[in-house]
Amino acid sequence: MAAKVEPFWIRKTLDQLSTEEWESLCDGCGLCCLQKLEDEEDNSVYYTRIACKLLDLTTCQCSDYANRRASVPDCIQLTPGQADEFKWLPPTCGYRLVSEGKDLPLWHHLVCGDRTAVHHERISQSGRMLSENSVAEDDWEDYLIFRAG
């Protein structure tokens, strides 16, 4: 009987992951690409339904991932070295879960084999977002959906 081999996200640290393994932790929810507002009083971060101009509102994929920083200079590129800063990511985020030593959820494509499960389970905001090009920044506060952390 062969020994069970744990999945890479369980048996490796973030620093041990290959580039392909690291990128595959992304569940494709697109929540990290939503505009966020910070409460000046307590520094809480709130997610809005307002998506980055490059985010496809249905697939939740960046329309120009390779060149995104040229169009969106403040686009955050997640790296394993930032794991201690991942608290702002949603609690369902693969990067955050693995950085906290937790397993991936059953709907994650690495577990179930279906990249659309994140949408079927309504983890993503697919079909429920607005492009930042269509909402004045002064109105973003009207579109808060949840508090980070």
Curated annotation (Swiss-Prot):
InterPro entries per UniProt: Puta_zinc/iron-chelating_dom (IPR005358), UCP006173 (IPR008228)
What's the domain of life for this entry? Answer: Bacteria
Pfam families, per database record: CxxCxxCC
Q: Which NCBIfam families match?
A: PRK05170.1-5, PRK05170.1-6, PRK05170.2-5
What PANTHER family does the record point to? UPF0260 PROTEIN YCGN
Tell me which family the UniProt entry assigns to this protein. Answer: Belongs to the UPF0260 family.
The name on file for this protein is UPF0260 protein PSPPH_1551
Instruction: Identify the species of origin.
Output: Pseudomonas savastanoi pv. phaseolicola (strain 1448A / Race 6) (Pseudomonas syringae pv. phaseolicola (strain 1448A / Race 6))
